[in-house]
A protein has these predicted regions:
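Active-site-adjacent pocket scaffolds in enzyme catalytic domains
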Residues: 35-46, 179, 186-294
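Active-site beta->alpha N-cap acidic-glycine motif
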Residues: 37-135, 307-316
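Metal-dependent polysaccharide deacetylase catalytic core of the NodB/CE4 family, i.e.
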Residues: 109-195, 211, 217, 294-297
């Protein structure tokens, strides 16, 4: 496993670093450095234990400057690449306040994962909001949405660049979020390709949630425009793939929540998927044989409707 994954497990299950086990090991016919961690206790998993959780909620924290029309995309962006220091927009600041109100109200106690762009930690206001959330809300987990929100599959394949970028984001987020961190990944902009699976595994990612299996979005799935190939590549590397919910092969998560016509289908699909259901436990989420409906939105959505917007969850949805 990657170092970020190991450190996350060690913190969670009371393990420790075991330098006495370090050394060289043979991997793929080559000697490589090996570091050791020990987990003295592990969660008890009963064989055949039923799983009642069927819904996983998450949101992406990317800002206006991260839109593919602004940056990160080789042809769509006004500035495909830049070195500007991130500063949070006033719209996202407003969305943060609305999201925190939702967490204190209708969203209280409901597990949710925030996929954070690591460079956002450079802005003191963003970091303060995230710290406030983590200190007051134990139902929140943090995962990676990349370091600078680069639309990777829109560019020529760059495994080394992706692994480097992702390793940096995982390390920064793990240091900031502590026990709330999870080594999970969502591709910025939903741009994912089969070649990305190996760098994800090498960086220590254990779960990917980048696949939007709709014909409308297949241009984002690499040169072959095939979401099945992306999912198979991810699973072949030993990662769990949690693809986004669709309806009639149409997207119903993320941007679909605000796109005319699609938004009607999206709201209906969310209500149906969450009616009388409960949120998936982490054990269920990490068990690839267990079906889970993955629903996600954007933090910026909370700035809509005069900062009164909230995800269209059915009121009967229960926490794990």
């Amino acid at each position: 496993a990657g170092v970020a994954t190991c450190e996350s497990l060690v913190r969670r299950w009371g393990g420790r670093r075991a330098e006495e086990g370090d050394g060289l090991v043979q991997v793929g016919g080559h000697l490589t450095e090996h570091v050791t961690f020990i987990l003295p206790r592990l969660p008890l998993v009963r064989s055949g234990e039923p799983s009642h959780g069927t819904v996983w909620l998450s949101l992406d924290t990317d800002d206006i400057c991260h839109l593919p029309s602004k940056s990160g995309h080789p042809t769509r962006s006004k500035r495909p690449e830049h070195d500007d220091t991130y500063r949070m927009s006033e719209k996202l600041a407003s969305a943060w306040k609305a999201f925190l109100r939702w967490r204190d109200g209708a969203g209280k106690g409901i597990p949710v994962t925030l996929f954070v762009v690591a460079e956002q930690l450079d802005d003191p206001r963003f970091a303060d909001h995230l710290r406030q959330l983590l200190d007051s809300d134990s139902a929140v987990t943090i995962a990676s949405h990349g370091n600078r929100h680069r639309c990777w599959s829109a560019w020529p394949a760059d495994p080394f660049g992706l692994q480097t970028d992702l390793s940096l984001s995982l390390r920064r987020l793990a240091e900031f979020a502590g026990d709330s961190f999870r080594p999970w990944f969502r591709a910025p902009g939903g741009y994912a390709a089969p070649w990305m699976a190996a760098p994800l595994a090498a960086a220590g990612v254990s779960l990917d949630s980048s696949v939007n299996p709709s014909w409308l979005t297949r241009r984002k799935a690499g040169p072959n425009r095939n979401w099945t190939s992306v999912s198979e590549a991810v699973r072949s590397e030993g990662l769990v793939e949690r693809q986004w919910l669709t309806a009639h092969s149409l997207p119903v998560t993320g941007p679909a929540l605000r796109i005319p016509l699609l938004s009607i289908l999206a709201r209906h699909s969310w209500k149906r998927a969450t009616k009388g259901m409960s949120c998936a436990s982490e054990m269920t989420l990490m068990s690839p044989e267990q079906p889970v409906d993955s629903l996600y939105w954007h933090l910026l959505d909370h700035a809509r409707r005069g900062a009164s917007w909230s995800p269209p969850l059915h009121p009967t949805l229960e926490s794990a």
